[in-house]
């Protein structure tokens, strides 16, 4: 309530974020932070791209339980397989790239979701002149420690359906490196 009653906050209750446009919120913005539930980010990324200025930064939280499909979510609504979590982040990043939202980095939230799900922040920058779903492009990102490959030896819930196993993600090495680092460094 404190946030809603702050005079600096412009509340848009009853707004479907999938249909959001810059003119709905007083013009294009420079930053978007999104923590959405019960919807795939891929469904709202077009609205985000339509609501930001070129060069804007976006920080959406990827919640794998809403990205992998209900048939691949474990008991209690938790995605336990790290490869499925990595796949969820990858698919959102690829969809973002097709809209000119370039991945700069990926980091795991240090706090698991209420049910224990591990969630991830994507740092995206809007570069409308670089939207290209055939060849993934990256902005420069801060360098960090080298990730480990420890989780890759664990079996996936359905390995034949993961994008790494079926070759869908070939050619996206740098993106996978960022994702695997985030999965490796995140909560277990």
Region locations from a protein language model:
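S-adenosyl-L-methionine
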Residues: 1-27
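Short SAM/SAH-binding signature in class I
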Residues: 27-35
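A short glycine-rich, Lys/Arg-flanked "PGG" loop and its adjoining helix->strand segment in the class I
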Residues: 42-57
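Short, glycine-/aromatic-enriched active-site segment of Class I SAM-dependent methyltransferases
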Residues: 64-80
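Short alpha-helix
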Residues: 85-99
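Flexible, glycine-/basic-rich loop-and-beta segments that form/coincide
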Residues: 118, 123-157, 161-188
């Amino acid at each position: 309530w404190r946030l809603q009653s702050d005079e600096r906050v412009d509340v848009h209750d009853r707004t479907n974020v999938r249909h959001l446009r810059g003119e709905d919120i007083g013009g294009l913005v420079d930053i978007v932070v999104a923590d959405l539930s019960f919807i795939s980010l891929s469904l709202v990324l077009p609205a985000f791209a339509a609501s930001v200025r070129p060069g804007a930064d976006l920080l959406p939280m990827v919640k794998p339980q809403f990205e992998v499909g209900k048939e691949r979510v474990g008991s209690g609504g938790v995605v336990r397989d790290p490869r499925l979590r990595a796949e969820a982040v990858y698919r959102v990043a690829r969809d973002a790239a097709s809209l000119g939202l370039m991945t700069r980095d990926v980091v795991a939230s240090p706090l698991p979701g209420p049910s224990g799900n591990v969630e991830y922040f994507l740092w995206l920058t809007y570069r409308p002149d670089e939207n290209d779903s055939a060849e993934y492009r990256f902005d420069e990102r801060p360098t960090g420690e080298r990730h480990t490959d420890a989780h890759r030896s664990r079996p996936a819930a359905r390995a034949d359906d993961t994008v790494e196993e079926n070759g869908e993600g070939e050619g996206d090495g740098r993106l996978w490196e960022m994702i695997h680092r985030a999965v490796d460094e995140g909560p277990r």
